Amino acid sequence: MKKLSFFLIVFMVNNLSAQDLSQYKKEKIVFETDTLNYRILKPLNYNPSKQYPVHLFLHGAGERGNDNKSQLVHGAKLFLKKENREQFNSWVIFPQAPKNDWWGYKDPYKFAYNVKESNAMSLVIKFMDEFIKREDVNQNKVYVSGLSMGGMGTFVILNLRPDMFAAATPICGDGDPNLVNNYAKKIPIWIFHGSDDSAVSPNNSLKMAKAIIDAGGSPKITFYENVGHDSWNNAFNEKDFLEWIHSKSKKTKQ
């Protein structure tokens, strides 16, 4: 009986988890002949007469594909927690890049101005440009987070749309330190990285933080000792991760 009860509990927990993620509605960005999958979480107790913040989340390379599901592996459950939905009620958007695409430029490790952004990033920007025009969106509270490849994409989209975002949290990412002038003094940024990351060197985040400071910005920087590439788990467990993000508005300075 105890063994049966255990399996029933496991089944219920797993089922509840799947049910939670199903709250992210499956959608598709369509622009001319191009398409891009995304999942979207509607604000709790949605009221069309209210204006809600928007949180864009860019996944890592391992979550690319066309299943419109893998991009929810990391981060999606954070926004589903009851206390977070109540305290930080917002639109949450998880686009999914195809297997052969990136959240940056066509060459994922080239960030220069003369390199065109990837098709996936181009579609996300087109989508966001339109989405934030909605009457139920607070344009002063649009945020972007990303991990690994998505951390790189976070720096890229800040450069391409510096007037869109009120705060950014790149996790274990990378970027071009020569491209920070567009956003360094405009956007509060909290950078995360694990000291033992062998996939994306923590020196990349240090490089970006230094460049932002040199350009007049004041980034918040958190490094985790003895943590590898999955520093996003630590970042999501920061007590004030969402609180810090939602405290930022384009109406106020850093």
How should each PLM-predicted stretch be described?
Residues 61-121:
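Active-site machinery of serine-nucleophile hydrolases
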Residues 88-90, 183-189:
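Short, proline-enriched alpha-helix->beta-strand connector loops that line the catalytic pocket
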